[in-house]
From Swiss-Prot:
Name of protein: Ribosome hibernation promotion factor
Matching InterPro entries: HPF/YfiA_ribosome-assoc, HPF_long/plastid, RHF-like, RHF/RaiA, Ribosom_S30AE_C, Ribosom_S30AE_C_sf
Family, as annotated: Belongs to the HPF/YfiA ribosome-associated protein family. Long HPF subfamily.
SUPFAM superfamilies recorded: Ribosome binding protein Y (YfiA homologue)
Source taxon at top rank: Bacteria
Pfam families, per database record: Ribosom_S30AE_C (PF16321), Ribosomal_S30AE (PF02482)
Quaternary assembly: Interacts with 100S ribosomes.
GO cellular component, one term: cytosolic small ribosomal subunit
Induction: Transcribed early in log-phase growth, peaks at log to stationary phase transition. Repressed by growth in the presence of glucose, which also decreases 100S ribosome content. Induced by growth in ethanol, NaCl, and 46 degrees Celsius; stress respones are under control of the sigma-B factor (sigB).
Length: 187
């Protein structure tokens, strides 16, 4: 069962908005054999230029669905978000099913329906093991976040793991889509 946590910034989340969000995101349930127990986090923001930004995060047991969209219309942003989430699910479903088909067993991980809405007969369930194709080991060097960003850019990576010189904790810097950088601090 999907539980919704809908927050608004510079906008009051009215009952019609809440109903629209829930109705649209509930359509994603058709992709799963059983409705997943998940907390759906939805942030609605309205900017001074009247653009509306919608962010949705749905943490699932084997997958985290996340999308954000900005447009001039809140309802259009919600529709676009659902389209993005559907594409993510279909892409992951294809990847998982291809992996299990290649191993000779398929897992009924997602719901399947063809054009007529019929479902396939029961299939054998294989072990749900994702294959790790490469392992790297390296020493974490103490540094600050600025130096970590420089190292990441120097290596041409989209993220970089390092030990924070002040806290001695393991941190991760990463490149964001907007060209800025993010920092993940571990406990």
């Amino acid at each position: 069962m999907l539980k919704y946590n809908i927050r608004g910034e510079n906008i009051e989340v009215t009952e019609p908005i809440r109903d629209y969000v829930e109705k649209k995101i509930d359509k994603l349930e058709r992709y799963f054999t059983e409705t997943p127990d998940a907390n759906v986090h939805v942030n609605l923001k309205v900017y001074s230029d009247k653009n509306a930004k919608v962010e949705v995060t749905i943490p699932l047991p084997n997958l985290v669905l996340r999308a954000e969209e900005t447009s001039g219309d809140l309802y259009a942003s919600i529709d676009l978000i659902v389209d993005k989430l559907e594409r993510q699910i279909r892409k992951h479903k294809t990847k998982v099913n291809r992996k299990f088909r290649d191993k000779g067993a398929e897992r009924d991980y997602f719901a399947y329906s063809d054009v007529n809405g019929s479902t396939p007969p029961e299939e054998n369930e294989g072990d749900f093991d994702l294959e790790i194709v490469r392992t790297k080991q390296f020493s974490l060097k103490p540094m600050d976040s600025e130096e970590a960003v420089l190292q990441m850019n120097l290596l041409g990576h989209s993220f970089y793991v390092y030990t924070d010189a002040e806290t001695n904790g393991t941190n991760i810097v990463y490149s964001r889509k907007d060209g800025k950088y993010g920092l993940i601090e571990t406990n």
